Amino acid sequence: MLINFFVLPIIGVLLFLGHLGGFVGLLSVRAAGILFVPCHWILVFYEKVCRLSVSLPGAVWITGQPDWQKLLLFYLILGAVLFATKKMKQRRGFVFIGCFMLLAVLHNPVKGFELDVLDVGQGDGMYLHTKEGTNFFFDGGSTDVSKVGTYRMLPFLKAKGVKKIDYWIVSHTDADHISGLKEILQAEYEIDHIVFSKYVLNDEAYQELLALAQTYGTEILKMDCGDTLTDGEAGLRCIFPDKTYKSDDKNALSLVLRYEDQEFSGIFTGDISSAEEQYLVEHKKAGSVTFYKAAHHGS
């Protein structure tokens, strides 16, 4: 409705000049080009209005992917609403109640603990939802899947009904760990924080990601060894690297985190090598876990 307030008053001008320019173009391309100039700027104005409307609070609803039972219930309620609008006198109240019920049916957020490892090809991408309702995402990129963020990661998040990521963990800045994250930032999906290691290499990829985060209002956090992101009874603790470990290798300085709650524990390793794994064992930083993400894609 709001968009129509801006679109409808000048759509007649757009159609008139567009058709006129088409006919004039049969005689003179130059003259038609002059007529198409205002058409171009009207369309640019429409695009700006649409982009602005999408950015308004509540403009985009992420409902999640419902199961077949909810879809069946959705169509039954929809049919009842349509039938009632024809038969009942108090239509408005019934329609309002029906619409509210439809929204309730279509709202499908993730509930309870969940860990998903996404198929992103040559790369990494994992989603973790805690019992408290906090959303974590670990890395997110690929070198052999085109637009992995647009066509795999973002559809996954929307299908799960995830409206935002609270903490997006970046183990390091290789393309197969951040290419999808960059696409999701550019899609203006809400990410509250991006988390790096305190010892992340300050390279071009890191600076590019910082610039994107600043553009889209995402806060940057850095974790040192021993730092913990707490979430009720759960915690995500940095166990590597620490200030004593020196390397110029981006993979070797991957941020390694240990997640633990009362029923589950897991280690997320990035692309560390066997040398860093041995370091974790020798310094007793790993411990036994329920889940271990094979380092460097299992290499």
Model features per residue range: what roles?
Residues 4, 15, 22-299:
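Non-globular, low-confidence helical/coil segments that flank catalytic cores
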